[in-house]
Amino acid sequence: MDIDEDDDLYQPEEPKLESAPAEDNKPKTDDLEEGEEEDEGAAMDEDDDDDDDSDIDIITERKDGTKPAPPQQSKYSDIRNIPQRTASNDMPAQPAPVKQESESRTSVNVAAPSADKTSAAASKSTIDVNVNPIHPGTGKPITQVNIDEDLPENDKPWRKPGTDISDYFNYGFDEFTWALYASKQETVRGEFGADVFAQNNKKMMEDFNMMMMGGMGMPGGGNSGGQQAGMSGGMDGMPPEMQAMMQQMMASGMDPSQMDPSQMNAMFSGMQNAGGAGAQGAQGGQGGNFGGGFGNNQGGFGYDQNMSGGGGGGGRGGFGGRGRRGRW
């Protein structure tokens, strides 16, 4: 009994069949078929999607033939939606420049050179601007040497081909520009040289003195006595009129010695003509007085009324006057 119960509790295992490996191969075939079925299902789904897309039609026209109105757009863009960028994000903050007071102070404290220092620096130069050296070959000043006439052909090596002209002429000069420069120097020295200036002043003073001496004898004989008295008391025998005019010229700041001789002659001749006219006027006044006295005398004494002249006229006038007084 006990064994039967144990048999019921513990049943013997069933023997395994040899068809088990065949069952293992089945799932492989089943898997392939399932994969193929999946591919076929995906292809069918794509065909269904294509059919769905082909069924969608886009209609842009209405049934009545009019096109729908386009959607309204705002005239102005919404500026509020535009993100604003701040300057602080764009530009990095730069540090403030530091003032360099020391450099500015040193630049301000630099003093300009004084006149004494400038003159001392200028006095160190040994160049004489008035020098005109003598050419040893010709014995003439260097600015008066004529290259074509004074120098022989052998003394012109700069004319040879291949010669560097800067070995004979400095500062960019050549034979032609040096001739022009020398001529210009001679002209300037002739006009503004110290010797020429002194000679011109001397000649001007001589002309001035000759003009003064010739002008003293010009006035007429009527005023010769007064002029001689004026010359004796005047300056260097100068007439009073000339002396007064010279004083006026010097008082106004003019130097008579620096004036043009022709201008001085014109001034003195005008003054002398004015003096001669005054003398003639004085003589005419004397003649008028003499004629008037003669006429009065003739009128008083009752001289011949037929006498011609200024005196007779005066007499006739007097006689007529007496008659008119009688008639009144």
Swiss-Prot record:
UniProt keyword terms in alphabetical order: mRNA processing, Nucleus
Regions of compositional bias (Acidic residues) in chain numbering: 1-11, 31-58
Matches recorded under Pfam families: Fip1
Main location: nucleus
Keyword Transmembrane: no
Extent of the signal sequence: none
Composition skew (Basic and acidic residues), residue ranges: 13-30
Superkingdom assignment: Eukaryota
Residues covered by region (Disordered): 1-159, 301-328
Residue stretches of biased makeup (Gly residues): 301-321
Cellular component per GO, a single term: mRNA cleavage and polyadenylation specificity factor complex
GO biological process, one term: mRNA processing
Subcellular location: Nucleus
Biased composition (Low complexity): 111-126
Role noted for this protein: Pre-mRNA polyadenylation factor that directly interacts with poly(A) polymerase.
Similarity comment text for this entry: Belongs to the FIP1 family.
Name by which UniProt lists this protein: Pre-mRNA polyadenylation factor FIP1
The organism of origin for this protein: Gibberella zeae (strain ATCC MYA-4620 / CBS 123657 / FGSC 9075 / NRRL 31084 / PH-1)
